[in-house]
Structure formats: C-alpha cells, structure tokens
C-alpha cells in the first residue's frame, strides 16, 4: 500500500510550513519526475479549498476545530501568528487529499525531526491523540523514524507523547 499521487504531493505541501520551502522544494522536482515516469499527468488537480479572501477565516476555523477555542484571535497576536493561521492552516490544513488524522501525523513527524520545537510537538501530539492517532500509534511512528531523526530527537518525541497522552487521557 502506497500513497496516491495526490497524497504524495499533499505530504510535500504540508512540509512547507514545518520544514521550510528551501528544504522541501527539491522534493517537488523529484516527486514530479517519479510521477511523470509512472505515467501520471501533471499538474494534478488542485486540492485547494480556500481563496486569498477567506484563507484567514478558514484557517482560524480549522485551528479552533483541531486545537480548541483558545486559538480564537491567535492571528491578532503578531505577524508570524497571522501567517501561521492564514498560510499554514488556511492554505494547507484546509486542502483536500489528506484527512485530519493523516495531516496531523505527518506534521508530528516533521516537528519531531526539527528538534527544539517541543511546545509545538506537544500541541500536535495532543491533537493527534484527540483525532485517534493514539499513544501506541505515535510511539510506532517515532520508532520508525529513529534512523532518520536520531535517538535524541526520538527520545524527546517519546517524552512529549507521554506528556500529551497524560494531558488528553489522564494518568494510567
């Protein structure tokens, strides 16, 4: 079982806000080359669901739906906050092609790979758990990523998942 062409591209689009376009851009060419070699017609149908006019509103709705009512007016707290709401959540989280569970799982992997982003990793671990990607699932994801992100970042991610599970589900 692999990813469909749309899913593969959505995994890349999701990476932009977490890894940065500079790190992700080369993978678009490689992915396009692979898809073309497999006979996939490019460009793929757009998965976008927002416009420049409604991306902030839709981003805030998505952020509140996933992270809770405390995210209301988050965009008003600074320029980077606004960018997070309208670009990350308005442009990417609202796209078709990946459901919330898959999009959050991918996001969890990207943040864990960064290291030093534990507050964000905790928020996304909690949201993963609330969406059904439970502690056991996230631990398996971390184990599969050890060769790619190393032991230190993996151990940090394990600590964060334990904290997230306790926050969402209470103590065992």
Annotate each predicted stretch with a short phrase.
Residues 1, 6-7, 16-17, 23-102, ...:
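Acidic, glycine/proline-rich low-complexity segments that act as flexible tails and inter-domain linkers
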Residues 11-12, 102-112, 121, 138-142:
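Short, structured motif recognition centered on aromatic/hydrophobic residues
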Residues 112-136:
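Glycine/small-residue-rich hydrophobic helix-like segments
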């Amino acid at each position: 079982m692999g990813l469909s062409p749309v899913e593969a591209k959505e995994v890349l689009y999701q990476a932009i806000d977490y890894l940065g376009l500079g790190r992700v851009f080369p993978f678009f060419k490689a992915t396009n080359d692979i898809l073309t070699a497999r006979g996939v017609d490019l460009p793929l149908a757009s998965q976008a669901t927002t416009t420049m006019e409604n991306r902030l509103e839709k981003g805030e709705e998505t952020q509140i739906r996933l992270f809770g009512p405390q995210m209301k007016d988050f965009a008003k707290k600074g320029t980077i906050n606004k960018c997070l709401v309208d670009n990350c959540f308005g442009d990417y989280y609202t796209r078709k092609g990946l459901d919330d569970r898959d999009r959050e799982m991918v996001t969890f992997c990207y943040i864990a790979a960064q290291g030093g982003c534990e507050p964000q990793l905790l928020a996304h671990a909690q949201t993963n758990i609330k969406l059904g990607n439970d502690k056991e699932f996230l631990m398996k994801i971390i184990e599969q990523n050890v060769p790619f992100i190393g032991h230190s970042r993996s151990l940090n991610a394990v600590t964060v998942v334990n904290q997230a599970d306790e926050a969402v589900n209470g103590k065992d």
